[in-house]
Curated annotation (Swiss-Prot):
Similarity comment: family membership: Belongs to the universal ribosomal protein uL10 family.
Protein name: Large ribosomal subunit protein uL10
UniProt keyword Ribosomal protein present: yes
UniProt xrefs under PROSITE patterns: RIBOSOMAL_L10
Length: 166
């Protein structure tokens, strides 16, 4: 099915805007995945703030040109599903990784983060990045642990001085 030039320009502009706003991108081959499963994936992605779209490779190459995701140009072969994480970098990788567990035909091709190419076998690195909330919780637990250790140390010093004075 031929796409009109105006429609092609609109697709390129839409994907380019998503690429400029994206923190990371994941590329996959969804050939053979059922429509129902893809609808579920899109719904989950939308809830997580991830932009997902199937785009022709030539249009995709033009859309990511000049962005941090042009390192992915070599994997734009065959049917291409691309996802851009807008809120936290690991969101798209995490969603695609979970989806791939239940779908034999869903194949993650590659990812990009901060202008660096990540092969499919390195997707776990990106997927394991904590969300903003998880990062804040980890930071707070570290601060709380250090604070409580300081309080225990000060209490021990006080007890030592009281014992020495008595």
């Amino acid at each position: 099915m031929a796409i009109k030039l105006e429609d092609k320009k609109a697709i390129v502009a839409e994907v380019n805007e998503a690429a400029k706003a994206g923190l990371s991108a994941v590329v996959a081959d969804a050939r053979g995945v059922t429509v129902g499963a893809m609808t579920g994936l899109r719904k989950e992605a939308r809830a997580a703030g991830v932009y997902v779209k199937v785009v022709r490779n030539t249009l995709l190459k033009r859309a990511v040109e000049g962005t941090q995701f042009d390192v992915l140009n070599d994997v734009f072969k065959g049917p291409t599903l691309i996802a851009f994480s807008n809120e936290h970098p690991g969101a798209a990788a995490r969603i695609f990784k979970e989806f791939a567990k239940g779908q034999d035909k869903f194949e993650i091709k590659a990812a990009a983060f901060e202008g660096k190419f990540l092969a499919a076998n390195q997707i776990d690195v990106l997927a394991s990045l904590p969300t903003r909330e998880e990062g804040i919780a980890q930071l707070m637990s570290v601060i709380q642990g250090a604070t409580s250790k300081l309080a225990r140390t000060l209490a021990a010093i006080r007890d030592q001085k009281e014992a020495a004075a008595a």
